[in-house]
Design a protein with these regions (language model features):
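N-terminal small/polar-rich segments of proteins
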Residues: 35-151, 175-219
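Short, contiguous, well-ordered secondary-structure segments
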Residues: 3, 31-34
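N-terminal secretory signal peptides that target proteins for export/translocation
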Residues: 1-16
Length: 219
């Protein structure tokens, strides 16, 4: 099994916009006091998967013959909730320290950081058959000392510049492993996720942190 934990444009919808690597997105962060998606085509080749969450590395672009590089950087998504708004039920939009805006497929500007986090990957097999599974695993809670916030308070919307289809769907963390989508061999799928904190619980002041891990596996 290949297992990755971690980050001419031809799409089913429009033209010119397909080893083992790891990426982790660290969700941190409560100091309490257009977007569109792409499914692109890649050629068959040796069995491999590539996954990028936030900042990633590639030797050039896929279209220019580039190949994936490992990038161990962990990006942080955060929000500071004003004391007057804590537990109000008004969702708080989160931002990221990721600066990744372009796709390594062809340097197309897919995402708009810091509001959006790039998430994308590809699956390749010699015969172009088989399917990879993209999933995300979260702990039950974010913590600040002995105080906690359910990780399910964090959700995301999905979109990307140039295509309105959420090919990596919107959702919320579930305190376990959540399957996001299947990726067929020969496809590069990418999206931009915008995260939000539901803010429905009154909690003590503090910085609440936790980490989620995105995984792309191919049997």
């Amino acid at each position: 099994m290949l297992h990755a934990t971690r980050p001419s444009r031809t799409n089913y919808r429009r033209p010119y916009r397909a080893a083992r690597l790891a990426a982790v997105l660290a969700m941190a962060a409560f100091s309490v006091a257009s977007a569109h998606a792409w499914v692109l085509t890649i050629t068959a080749g040796p069995k491999a998967v590539f996954l990028q969450v936030g900042i990633g590395s590639y030797s050039g672009t896929y279209q220019s013959g580039g190949t994936p590089l490992n990038n161990a950087q962990v990006n942080v998504v955060s929000v500071t909730v004003p004391a007057s708004a804590v537990g109000s039920g008004t969702a708080q939009t989160m931002t990221s320290d990721s600066t990744q805006s372009v796709s390594f497929y062809d340097n197309f500007v897919v995402c708009n950081p810091p509001a959006q986090v790039y998430i994308g990957g590809w699956v390749r097999t010699p015969a172009g058959t088989g399917t990879g599974v993209l999933s995300v695993t979260s702990p039950a809670t974010l913590t600040s000392g002995t105080t906690t916030i359910p990780f399910s308070q964090i959700s995301w919307t999905s979109t990307a510049n140039g295509n309105t289809t959420p090919d990596i769907p919107a959702g919320s963390f579930n305190g376990g492993t959540l399957t996001l989508r299947n990726i067929a061999a020969g496809n590069w799928v990418e999206n931009c996720h915008t995260f939000a904190y539901a803010n429905t619980t009154v909690v003590a002041a503090g910085t609440y942190t936790g980490r989620v891990t995105y995984t792309l596996s191919l049997p």
